[in-house]
């Protein structure tokens, strides 16, 4: 649970869930290994850290856990946005969403495209491919996967492992079952049965759905424009891009929720306080982040 590589560095967080920061991790020469937007990161089965950027000189940059450069690949994803890893036990696969090309790809760990998903034309909202601007994916253990169309028509699309559409739900709208900004999605295995947790970023909430798309719960996070939920152990982690709204640049932090969906710690954010069961509005408290977009928690608990 620590990023402490240096001693006597500031500690961030609350309620015993605290971290110190190593600002030198992953520092590379930007002329040789440039990064435009650092959108998401995952850890593979070898323990390496993969970074996704929409810089087409090197869309995927791979580091070892100490932050040293290993390799990079990818020149064909100008809108690289969402990065999800599928670990089968035998090999790893990546799912990348491209908001500029209006596509989602299943890719080998070294960059070979295996499957391409285009706009689902059978759904009326997607008669034009430009309506499909996918931001995130989540993969079930059986290989089926979900796509969150967070910058497009706001549908959640469920596919089998071969890429055939099975179901869709959500869409843009005002009711609780609809979305305004379905920016992120993950599978939550912490309960008796798996469920989906989906971001509605501009509304400052996570929404829990059954795997077949039935709304189960809304988790209110006032003031927090949360990106994708990331679950590690009993905790849910999320980057808060901005607070209290998307119009406030350079105002982000990282939030951590326990399995009761209570915010227990904020890195760079205000101390979480509840009154009569309701969370007080959150905000940036320390400028250690500008506009954080994702959280990757490694196998040692470092962020």
Where are these regions (language model features)?
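Beta-rich, blade/repeat-based domains predominating
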Residues: 31-46, 76-92, 122-144, 174-195, ...
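Residue position within the beta-strands of beta-propeller blades
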Residues: 51-52, 96, 147-148, 198, ...
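Short loop/turn segments that connect beta-strands within beta-propeller blades
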Residues: 63-68, 108-112, 160-164, 210-214, ...
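Loop/turn-rich, solvent-exposed surfaces of beta-rich toroidal or solenoidal domains
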Residues: 192-193, 222-273, 278
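Blade/loop signatures of beta-propeller domains
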Residues: 2-24
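WD40 beta-propeller blade core
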Residues: 61, 71, 105, 115, ...
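Short loop/turn segments immediately following the C-termini of beta-strands
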Residues: 54-55, 99, 150-152, 190, ...
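Surface-exposed loop and turn segments in beta-propeller and other repeat-based domains
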Residues: 23-32, 74, 114-132, 164-180, ...
